[in-house]
């Protein structure tokens, strides 16, 4: 087991081509520098638990494998600190990737201090500092002019230095799981930034400078405290994905409609009572997430989103759908789970590309015949819908693979259920069924285990 641990540690610490010289001698030399550095901080780990010796053995275990160096230095207070580089700096200065992520070195997972020394690594292209306890970044971070990826996920950052704006080659910035309330205006200087992850912070608004990120393709602001978005967000002409789940938005700025390259917008779990009209201008939108809001109507203008492929309206307060929904000819999935629908428009039958239709937890007692014309359906969810009967036309859905009829009032099923030869999952839980049609039982036997039927009384399959 110890040998396995040594090998794993070696994989985390041995040099990578173009990052550190791939020879055992230089690797041992690096270890010696680490020992020297530890001694200079007043803490020598060489004897107390064999960590340095395990490090050397790990390097020997796979010296020829390509991976990156991962290392930290512990200061005399027991805190994890990168405070200076070893005396032989050439090996460090050549690094283009450095990973100090807490999950890799379990012994060193609480890095609290990142000193200005980091700014000397001018060739660095990727820096990973996730899962530590950093509260600030040094201004010297701005000296990493070649940095392309910076990952600071799961730290304790409350602010970013203005010098972050000097990272002109930065393409990906991950600030997920911190305590940020604002971004410096200098963030707008990151002209090559393509991905910005700000999930689970404490933002209530964004700076206007966000609109200067002309190459931004994805921004994720899930689980913050946003009540508004700046109008400047409409300037992000290359934006393709906008994630706003779990905020406090009641509307969107009209400028959202200028995002003509937007493919996906997710507004789950906000406070929308009406659909912002700017949404209808997003002609290239493919995925619209509106679940967990307070929508009571869906306007006819939804039909303008001709490229829409997925529409999620789960857990709102809809009582009807507009007939114009039938004009969404590219729609492949619609989720209407947990609304107040009693019927569907007849135009639903026009959605011939529809593959998934989720209608659970509504107030249906019967279903419109038009559903049975959706020949490409592979998933139909009708759970908790107050159904007392199921029409024979169910047998027309020859491509159906998943059918959920749980939590209804069904006492019988039509014989045509046996025609669903592609079905592999049928949920009938919580229905007062007294028997199953012979055709369904025969289908179950013929599928030889490929069809899973969930029943309160499995004995019904044996009758």
Regions found by a protein language model. Name each.
Residues 2-120, 126-128, 142, 148-151, ...:
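The feature captures the LRR N-terminal capping module
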């Amino acid at each position: 087991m110890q040998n396995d641990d040594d090998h794993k540690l070696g994989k985390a610490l041995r040099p990578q081509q173009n990052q550190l010289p791939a020879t055992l001698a230089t690797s041992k030399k690096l270890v010696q520098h680490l020992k020297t550095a530890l001694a200079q901080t007043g803490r020598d780990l060489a004897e107390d638990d064999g960590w340095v010796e395990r490090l050397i053995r790990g390097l020997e275990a796979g010296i020829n494998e390509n991976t990156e160096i991962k290392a930290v230095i512990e200061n005399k207070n027991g805190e994890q600190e990168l405070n200076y580089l070893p005396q032989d700096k050439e090996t460090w200065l050549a690094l283009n990737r450095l990973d100090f992520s807490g999950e890799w070195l379990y012994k060193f997972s609480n890095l609290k201090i990142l000193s200005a020394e980091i700014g000397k690594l001018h060739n660095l292209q990727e820096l990973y500092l996730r899962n530590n306890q950093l509260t600030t970044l040094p201004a010297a971070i701005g000296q990493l002019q070649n940095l392309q990826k910076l990952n600071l996920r799961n730290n304790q950052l409350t602010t970013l230095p203005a010098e972050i704006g000097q990272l002109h080659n930065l393409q990906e910035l991950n600030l997920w799981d911190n305590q940020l309330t604002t971004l410096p205006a200098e963030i707008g200087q990151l002209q090559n930034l393509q991905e910005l992850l700000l999930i689970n912070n404490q933002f209530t608004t964004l700076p206007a400078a966000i609109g200067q990120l002309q190459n931004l393709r994805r921004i994720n602001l899930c689980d913050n405290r946003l009540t508004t978005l700046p109008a400047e967000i409409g300037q992000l002409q290359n934006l393709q994905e906008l994630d706003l789940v779990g905020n406090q938005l009641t509307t969107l700025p009209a400028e959202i409609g200028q995002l003509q390259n937007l493919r996906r917008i997710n507004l789950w779990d906000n406070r929308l009572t009406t659909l912002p009209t700017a949404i209808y201008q997003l002609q290239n939108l493919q995925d619209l997430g509106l679940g967990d809001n307070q929508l009571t109507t869906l306007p006819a203008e939804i039909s303008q989103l001709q490229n829409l492929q997925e529409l999620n309206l789960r857990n709102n307060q809809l009582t009807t759908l507009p007939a114009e929904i039938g004009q969404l000819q590219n729609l492949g999935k619609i989720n209407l789970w947990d609304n107040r629908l009693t019927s569907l428009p007849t135009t639903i039958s026009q959605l011939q590309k529809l593959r998934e239709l989720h209608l659970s937890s509504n107030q249906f007692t019967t279903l419109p015949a038009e559903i049975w014309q959706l020949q490409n359906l592979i998933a139909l969810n009708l759970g908790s819908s107050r159904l007392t009967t199921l029409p024979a036309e169910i047998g027309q859905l020859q491509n159906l693979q998943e059918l959920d009829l749980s939590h209804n009032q069904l006492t019988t099923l039509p014989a045509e259920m046996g025609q669903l030869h592609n079905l592999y999952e049928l949920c009938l839980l919580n229905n007062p069924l007294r028997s199953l049609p012979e055709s369904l039982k025969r289908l179950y036997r013929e599928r030889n285990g490929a069809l899973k039927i969930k029943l309160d009384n499995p004995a019904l399959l044996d009758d």
